[in-house]
Amino acid sequence: MEVIEKLETIRETLNDTKDKKDFQKIHDELVQYLDGIDPLTIDDDKWNEILKLFKIIIVKLKNSTIKTTSLENELTQHEKKRTVKEVEKVEEDMKVDVANDNSKPTLMDKVLQVSSQPNNPYSADVLQIRTILSKTLFVDTDSEAYSLYVPESQKLDVSPITIELTTIEKYQPKVNILKQAVIVPSQNPLLADTYGAPEILFSTDFFDDITSNSSEGLQLYFFDKAYKLKKELPNLPFLSSLDKDVNPLNPLNSVCKSFGQEKYYDMVMDRTDRGLDARRAAMQFDNVIVDAQNRTVQFNVRMHPFDLQLLRISQQFAEPMQDLAPVVREYMMLGADGYVLTQKTRLDRDQQLIANRRSVVFDRMCELSGPLYRSRIVHSMRMMSKLWRTNVFRTSLEDEITKIYAAAEVSMVSIDATTSALSTINIASAEQTLNALLNMSFFRCELDLIGSQSSFGAAMSAMIALMILPTDQENMDDEVFDVLCNLVYNELIAWAADRPVFVRRAGATNAFRQFVNAGLNRDITNYMRFVLLRRPWLPLYNSRDVRRNAHVLVPNVDLANINDQVYVAINSFLNGIIEASRRNPNPNKTISANSFRKLMKNMRDICVNRLMPVIRLIRYNVERIGMILHMLPYSADIFDINRNLRDERLRIKIPMSGFLSLVMGITKAPDAFDWSQVLNFADDVRKMDYAEAISIEDSASVAIMRNDANRATSKKEIFISEVKPPTPTVASIQKIPSATLTAMFSDRQLINLIRDTHSFRVIREIAVALQAAFDNSPTSQHGVGKGAVLHPVPQNFGRSSQFVRRDNILLQRPAGIQQFTIEDLKQGRYFQGLMAQIRARQPIIVNGPIPLRISDAAEIEQVTLAFLTMNSPYDAYIDPRDLKQQKLLTDREVDLFIDQNPARPNDEFDNVMARTSVFIIDAPRAIVPINPQRLNFPYHDIMVTDSVTKFIEFTVALTPDLQLFNGLLVFEQ
């Protein structure tokens, strides 16, 4: 209701207002007020009433000769926001309808269903993208007629960038410990076995999931588990705290309770258990020693070798860091331009900053995919757009253009025809062009000229553009260069010099090249020759790595010398046009001769006098942002990397009349550079690079490893399923067509870069440690054995350890028995040798991870399936289908039997019946060592940061006028 009352008040005020300045003031205030309104919070009825009032006010302002373009654009933006909200509501309703419907609709059904709605989301997406990217992609703000293909919308889950830093004491041991009693066998068949002294063992619960996740192969299981473990490992190579307690057996010493040691000490301190006396004797020497001078700590632990290996990996492959002090000094030097930067506090010697982790893998992926490269460049442009200082324009150019017309004495009869000469000159074009020029200094782009190409204003603007823009072939396409030259010739030179208009044809595409020696005015010819030199821009800062950032370029125009070639060329060209028009009774197609000559004199003064502030403004911005070139986001030129990929560059739109608008529109010096904002931006880029590198390299490493283990797996599908996009650029990888992504992951250079990443090395080291843990830990109880021995005749059960009564586990492979591996048998290798051993009734050993079927004592004692398979292993292990194909078709299970129940006496009948032909090969159980392992780690507070600016205090010390680094003022009135 407040909005409606405000608009009613403004409408009444307009009725009483008569002065044009007051109308303009009301218009500007209304634009600001409309910008502060949130259209999504207003009801439909109230919004319709507000629209009516706005339209009435706009009509009144137009009647008062006030240009209302900005107000109408703002109102259109608000309407589009409401349209997008309605579209989202319609799409949600559609999803509910589709969920209720059993049949799945096709894409065409969706399109037809949506098209019947009052608001079509496909067209709405176009409008929304136009709204969001208009300033970034430099879409023509005047013309509504353009097409844009929008694929089917996808929701992208982009998580905020957070960097979690964990120290070593946060590590949770993966291998638990347990206390288990020894079984003492009875020599008397009438007496049951008894329990002996207990022992502390390492458990193997860590491999509980091995049967459910190793169906595709044990190697894939190791890689998947290594990837999960990498996320759980600490990423800082030091301790910041340690859980200590007094040694209960020696009050002068301390014991470490971290890393799961508290559980061990609780077990050992059971004084009723005399079997642990040796452990208690060793425990009294456990101690924690802190060296405050060297900042280290030594302590005792009893951990499984696998846990110790993971600790070493986490310390060796901790996240790379850099010293904070040099970076703070660099920031202080950068901000010395107009600011005084001081450290807030003294920095500790161990104060660290996360290193600049720039992913060469991501850079290579951008080189292989044009859409991904452009997406990343657009994202970088969007990030950098907030850094520019371009608040140098007046609110409107209408008064300026009116003065030019008045000075040219244009009669009111021909005002319509003349108005078209400068009708495209406006502030929107100037801002768009200035943004384009600033971005072209850091990014290499292709130009796309838009707007009218047949007016006097566009021709004057093209004449200036040929002086400012880089016209060399590497930076400007021949087509764009020809269009600019032909426009200047046809609209300015041909009419003024009374020459025929140039028409493009095969072999003659450039008017300047065609007529440079055709006897034109000498001043005009000099300008044409200077343009045909096709001069590039000057390099201002060289990039350290062209695969990451392109060189920073600036226009090749002098900042102080008015006799520079560019200024002289423009001045002489306009003098030549004026001179030629003196002898010509009809020097322009729409403007009378006298008016044209006076108009050209005014334009000469404007172009020559106001070009230098434009060049200084560009240099003022580029000089300062270029100083942090090595901290900026990705801005590489794909043409530098591969000369065949010029078409993959981003194409930016520049209004044809933008350069004249820019020259006429600058009226003041820009705002001062806020170095606090610029250096905070550098911190944000460092965090973004870190998050992108982690996300890309982790998922790519898993994809390569899984493909190495099984060539049938798709690297592309694994990568897409594993990647967690931290930025829209990473999320855009999911939109790359399937075949293109497959081709990218076939690139040998990309794969080699992935293999050389920090993530790949960590995951590979963890997988190797997992393989060693599997080989040396008992895993038969979890359903997987190291191998099996198949006998032709049933044998007595053995006893693999002192913790069981009997079992069919062997800890060593018997000598003198033929061995086969499962992989060979599945490939059909040596299968005939296996059959020969079976026919000869010889025992065989099958090596490799073998799935097990666990049986209990009751099943063995009765004639059950377990009894039969354990006593006829050949028939159970070899299937008739294997004989047809002469290879092992699938992994076959074998029986595992463990009897740990001593609560009954031995029975002769049991001993006769309970025999087996299958023995499982496994590793022995690991006993927790009595004497501890001594660990030594750095020990200090967490002094790692991802932000430098929070350690710096900014104090403004600005000069009265804004200057370039060489002392020149940006703008002089």
Swiss-Prot record:
Record key words, sorted: Capsid protein, Inner capsid protein, RNA-binding, T=2 icosahedral capsid protein, Virion
Signal peptide range in chain numbering: none
Provenance organism: Rotavirus X (strain RVX/Human/China/NADRV-J19/1997/GXP[X])
Places the protein is found: Virion
Keyword GTP-binding recorded: no
GO CC annotation terms, alphabetical: T=2 icosahedral viral capsid; viral inner capsid; viral nucleocapsid
Keyword presence, RNA-binding: yes
Protein's recorded name: Inner capsid protein VP2
